[in-house]
Design a protein with these regions (language model features):
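ATP-binding pocket architecture of kinase catalytic cores
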Residues: 1-103
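Short, solvent-exposed loop/turn segments at secondary-structure junctions
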Residues: 2-3, 34-38, 45-47, 110, ...
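Alpha-helical elements of Rossmann-like donor-binding domains used by nucleotide-donor carbohydrate transfer enzymes
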Residues: 10-17, 56-63, 127, 131, ...
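Short strand-connecting beta-turns/loops that link adjacent beta-strands
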Residues: 36, 165-167, 221
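Active-site Asp-x-Gly
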Residues: 94-106, 145-151, 158-214, 230-233
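Hydrophobic alpha-helical segments that form the core
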Residues: 217-225
């Protein structure tokens, strides 16, 4: 059921946009049919996570990202520019390019959710926002990404990876132009199986910029602050602890 204006339109456009990176890209659940407020997808057979499937997925994800996007925060093709959604939280999708990744991440992926934090937590996050916006933390996309932004899933926590007998199939995207490292970092927020093997195979297929392992926490902050906005609780302490490392 569609709980948000345009949520199904956004999901359908995102699935089709990600699937357009096939056959080299990652597996994406098929859209069988959809209408106003509803979406039909096939029932996926369940397999077991394996090292081999993880490595295959890592290589394929590199090619999905390499399919690219026009700019950071770009909406998927076919979606009239509007806010998207990550879970039940709104997701700003700017229609114009932003000058740097740090400015984009600060303005559109951290700041919109800071009103959920207490004053002390907001103070730390404000320092991080300033540092991000300065460009001091900017870094390159992986080698295969030659567009201004990667074509990202946008919500790649463990539950959105379906391990089928034919390999990993992605569901429930918050698809957008983003930094590839954010998808890779999100794998570890809730412990996706073989996350290290996924990242290692990805790095072999499309070498990541130096220091990428140190930046995993930085790229998890968007997903974590969204969880602060939605749920509060222990997510705040985790978010602030990571942010302190970067201010």
């Amino acid at each position: 059921t569609d709980h948000h204006k345009n949520a199904i339109d956004y999901e359908v456009a995102g699935l089709m946009w990600l699937a357009a990176a096939r056959p080299d890209g990652a597996g994406i659940v098929e859209v069988l049919d959809h209408g106003k407020g509803w979406l039909t997808e096939p029932e996926l057979s369940t397999g077991h996570p394996t090292r081999e499937a993880a490595e295959d997925f890592g290589r394929r994800l590199a090619h999905t990202h390499a399919a690219g996007a026009s700019h950071l925060g770009a909406a998927p093709d076919g979606f009239v520019p509007d806010d998207g959604y990550i879970g039940r939280a709104p997701l700003p999708l700017p229609s114009e390019p932003i000058s740097s990744w740090g400015e984009f991440y600060a303005q559109y992926r951290i700041e919109p959710y800071m009103d959920s934090l207490d004053a002390d937590a907001r103070a730390i996050m404000s320092k991080l926002v300033d540092r991000l916006a300065s460009g001091a933390l900017d870094h390159d996309e992986p080698a295969l990404v030659t567009c201004p932004a990667a074509r990202t899933h946008g919500d790649m926590w463990a539950g959105n990876l379906m391990w089928t007998p034919d390999g990993v199939v992605l569901i429930d995207p918050a698809a957008q132009g983003g930094h590839a490292e954010e998808d890779l970092a999100a794998l570890s927020v809730f412990g996706a199986p073989f996350a290290e093997r996924i990242r290692a195979a990805y790095n072999e297929e499309s070498p990541l910029a130096d220091g990428w392992e140190d930046r995993i926490g930085l790229h998890q902050l968007h997903m974590l602050i969204v969880h602060c906005w939605l749920f509060g609780g222990g997510y705040v302490d985790q978010t602030v602890a990571i942010a302190r490392r970067w201010v």
